[in-house]
């Protein structure tokens, strides 16, 4: 007996979605448009009657897992164009005050632990970074770009060869998207 694996997702008001022949899912909402390629053998995606249906051809374990993964990706895309994602970070230092500023698609961290050379973190995609005092806010419509940009910033202030319990300087994620 073959059990059919399918999940349905309601499309919220004010959001239009489409799924093209080349397996690209597109969501458009008040904050913008975001696209993502969703392909896996045996998985079909249909957009009809105000809902998105993710369907598996067989009941194999891998396909069942991918149905859940695709469902989560689609929900994140629709939430991103409707509400957006925001990640809050805080700047901590003990002795040397850091100068943090945004320059185009990079975040420049100066005077980190008294270093002369600034550290540079990449900002991905359409992500916006705002620095105000000791707070850094990373926001955007793509959850993966927001999370990866926040991780890039946190990694650039990682201290090697020092005890992290004592040397706690850095920029740390306080609230995830």
Swiss-Prot record:
GO biological process: cytoplasmic translation
Pfam families with a match to the protein in the record: Ribosomal_L6 (PF00347)
Chain's role: This protein binds to the 23S rRNA, and is important in its secondary structure. It is located near the subunit interface in the base of the L7/L12 stalk, and near the tRNA binding site of the peptidyltransferase center.
InterPro entries cross-referenced by the UniProt entry: Ribosomal_uL6-like (IPR000702), Ribosomal_uL6-like_a/b-dom_sf (IPR036789), Ribosomal_uL6_a/b-dom (IPR020040), Ribosomal_uL6_arc (IPR019907), Ribosomal_uL6_CS2 (IPR002359)
Species in which this protein is naturally found: Methanosarcina barkeri (strain Fusaro / DSM 804)
Lineage: Archaea, Methanobacteriati, Methanobacteriota, Stenosarchaea group, Methanomicrobia
Record-level GO cellular component terms: cytosolic large ribosomal subunit
An annotated Gene Ontology molecular function: structural constituent of ribosome
Keyword annotations from UniProtKB, A to Z: Ribonucleoprotein, Ribosomal protein, RNA-binding, rRNA-binding
UniProt family annotation: Belongs to the universal ribosomal protein uL6 family.
Subunit structure: Part of the 50S ribosomal subunit.
Protein name: Large ribosomal subunit protein uL6
Residues annotated as signal peptide: none
């Amino acid at each position: 007996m073959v059990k059919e694996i399918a999940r349905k997702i309601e499309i919220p008001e004010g959001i239009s979605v489409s799924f093209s022949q080349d397996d690209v899912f597109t969501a458009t909402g008040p904050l913008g448009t975001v696209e993502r390629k969703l392909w896996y053998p045996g998985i079909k995606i249909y957009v009809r009657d105000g809902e998105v249906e993710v369907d598996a051809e067989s009941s194999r374990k891998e396909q069942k897992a991918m149905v859940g993964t695709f469902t989560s990706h689609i929900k994140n895309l629709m939430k991103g164009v409707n509400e957006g994602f925001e990640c809050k970070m805080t700047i901590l230092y003990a002795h040397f005050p850091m100068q943090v500023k945004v320059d185009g698609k990079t975040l420049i961290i100066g005077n980190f632990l008294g270093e002369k050379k600034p550290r540079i973190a990449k900002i991905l995609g359409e992500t916006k970074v705002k620095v105000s005092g000791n707070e850094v806010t990373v926001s955007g419509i793509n959850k993966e770009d927001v999370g990866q940009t926040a991780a890039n910033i946190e990694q650039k202030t990682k201290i090697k060869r020092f005890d992290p319990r004592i040397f706690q300087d850095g920029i740390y994620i306080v609230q995830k998207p």
